[in-house]
Structures are given as C-alpha cells and as structure tokens.
C-alpha cells in the first residue's frame, strides 16, 4: 500500500516516473511546464539539471539558502527562502556562471510556488497615468495566465504582483494567496495549470 499512500499516479501519456514539484523546475529533469531558468551557451546547455549541493542556514527555523548546481551547464543557482514574523515567505534567486564561456540568460524566476487545483481566479492590477491600480479579474483555467512588463522600469499598466483566490473569496473573507515581485524593471509572472491538476506560480525578471 505504500506506493498508493506515498506516490501519485502517472497520467497517460507521460514519462514513466513522477517528476515532483520543485522550487526551481528545469527541462533537464523532465519538467515540461514553465521553467525557473532559460539560459544557454551559444545555443547549447539549455536543458539544465540541478541537484542540491549545500543547504546554508541563515537563521535556523526561519531562513536558509539552497544551493543548486549543474556541473555540466556550469552554473549555480542559489535560492534564498525566508519566513518572516508575519508568516510571509520571501524568495530570492541568484545565478552564478561557474564556466569560462559567456552564459546568455533570458529568464530567471525569483521562485516557483504551488497553488491548489481549486484556485478559481487571479486578481491583478492594470492602469495608465493617473489611473493606476485598476482591478483586473481573470478566471484560471488550463490556459497559461501571464502578465509581462517590457518597459525596463516600473510601469503604470503592469503591477508586479497579483492575488489568487479560491472559490467564494471576497475582500473580507475566504482563502487567497498574494505575491509581489520587488523589481523595477522587465518582469514576468505566470500561473500555469499542471498535469496533476495543481497550478504553479512564477515571478521573475528577464
């Protein structure tokens, strides 16, 4: 009974192993959703395969740095996770090129977090000059939800954050998840439906 209790069924047609959700998903391990990193060296080494090399406790019980290495692609990805006194999770990522050749980075997520499959809608904020923070509500489905800023700075039309709500959530009650990217440049956030029925949420810069 252990496989039924501890594992998840493999949906057809898919790889014959269960690729678990991670904080830094990548193509090299068989993850076919949005990845945490898009980078290459002259068109090669684009499918990174990270493995944990060290865990550094910054504050035991509250903050740590997870160091992930790919010796073939010659890169190190360090993920900083911190839970503050209000139970807000802070995520930061740092990418280091450990090779001799130039590495072209097209996208790096500050973090990847799971969302429950019953998540119903995403509430984001749009606008224009003197009319910022206008509420935009979109239903979540099996389509990819994406919001992107290409202006190279903070914009009036694309706030780097959103709120994901479960059914029945209002401004005063219910279950919601909020996230904000602390970056005043080009940025992107995506919410993607996964094959197991859950969602993943990414925010980062490009």
Labelled PLM ranges:
Residues 1-206:
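Polysaccharide-binding surfaces and accessory modules of carbohydrate-active proteins
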């Amino acid at each position: 009974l252990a496989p039924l209790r501890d594992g998840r069924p493999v949906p057809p047609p898919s790889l014959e192993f269960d690729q678990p959700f991670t904080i830094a998903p990548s193509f090299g391990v068989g993850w076919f959703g949005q990845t945490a990193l898009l980078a290459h060296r002259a068109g090669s080494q684009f499918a990174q395969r990270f493995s944990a090399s060290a865990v550094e406790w910054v504050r035991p019980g509250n903050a740590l740095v997870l160091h992930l290495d790919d010796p073939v692609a010659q890169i190190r990805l360090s993920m900083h996770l911190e839970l503050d006194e209000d139970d807000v999770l802070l995520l930061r990522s740092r990418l280091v090129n450990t090779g001799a050749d130039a590495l072209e980075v097209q996208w790096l997520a500050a973090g990847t977090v799971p969302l429950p499959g019953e998540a119903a809608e995403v509430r984001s904020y749009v606008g224009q000059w003197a009319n910022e923070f206008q509420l935009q509500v979109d239903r979540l489905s099996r389509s990819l939800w994406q919001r992107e800023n290409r202006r190279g700075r903070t914009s009036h039309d694309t706030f780097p954050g959103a709120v994901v709500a479960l059914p029945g959530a209002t401004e005063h009650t219910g279950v919601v998840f909020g996230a904000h990217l602390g970056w005043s440049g080009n940025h992107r956030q995506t919410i993607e439906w996964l094959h197991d029925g859950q969602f993943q949420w990414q925010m980062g810069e490009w």
